[in-house]
Amino acid sequence: MASSTMALSSTAFAGKAVNVPSSSFGEARVTMRKTAAKAKPAAASGSPWYGPDRVLYLGPLSGEPPSYLTGEFPGDYGWDTAGLSADPETFAKNRELEVIHCRWAMLGALGCVFPELLARNGVKFGEAVWFKAGSQIFSEGGLDYLGNPSLIHAQSILAIWACQVVLMGAVEGYRIAGGPLGEVVDPLYPGGSFDPLGLADDPEAFGELKVKELKKGRLAMLSMFGFFVQAIVTGKGPLENLADHIADPVNNNAWAYATNFVPGK
């Protein structure tokens, strides 16, 4: 009897129907099913970014974090004064929104700075300042991508909009749906084709990369907000504003502009 019980508990029979001879259990039939626990985010063991002993937002001066912020997810510094993460479903949605916005902000910040950097080093663009570049599509000659007429030559804002919707919608749909075979478990970190360098192969390194992504992404979102404010206030790109500040920091800073700014002038 004991040996039969031990044999039935073996993982080799997980998920299979096991017929036991009637000589052992009468006319009994035992069905065993494998149940998988819900996967939890992997955290790097001994990492300072995860768990109850993780780094908090004010270091040793931080108060007790809310009970629902356990350090299970990357970027959790125990700070949620507004209680935005108290509801698990809202927390999951906000986590996804933050990661996606972080990635867009990092790409956006690079796209704002890099063309202006190239233009300041002799590369010819029709317009290198990020918030002015798009308006070139309304010019007589249209907009040449990278200033090269042999690349994409855009003359219709509606066509550009349609292409963006189709292309980005396809990529996002692919990510959210889990790929063509639905093999992606976590749409935030799909891996596979989205990780050609295999950066997620090591769980501990992957856990640290998640934290780095969020930290840099949060800075990028603040940077993009600053770029928008600069564009409204000074009408210049981020690198030109930086050059002006270095040349005359007393008269070219946020405080000076705030005290002298008159909207519409």
Swiss-Prot record:
Entry binding sites for chlorophyll a 2: H101
Transmembrane residue ranges: 99-119, 151-171, 219-239
Compartments in which it is found: Plastid, Chloroplast thylakoid membrane
UniProt GO molecular function: chlorophyll binding; metal ion binding
Binding site for chlorophyll a 5: K212, Q230
Amino acids binding chlorophyll b 2: R103, I152, L181
Entry keyword annotation includes DNA damage: no
CC terms in the record's Gene Ontology section: chloroplast thylakoid membrane; photosystem I; photosystem II
Phosphothreonine: residues bearing it: T35
Positions bound to chlorophyll b 5: Q164, F261
Positions that bind chlorophyll b 3: S156, E172
Classification via Gene3D superfamilies: Chlorophyll a/b binding protein domain
Domain notes: The N-terminus of the protein extends into the stroma where it is involved with adhesion of granal membranes and post-translational modifications; both are believed to mediate the distribution of excitation energy between photosystems I and II.
Function: The light-harvesting complex (LHC) functions as a light receptor, it captures and delivers excitation energy to photosystems with which it is closely associated.
Official protein name in the record: Chlorophyll a-b binding protein, chloroplastic
Native species: Zea mays
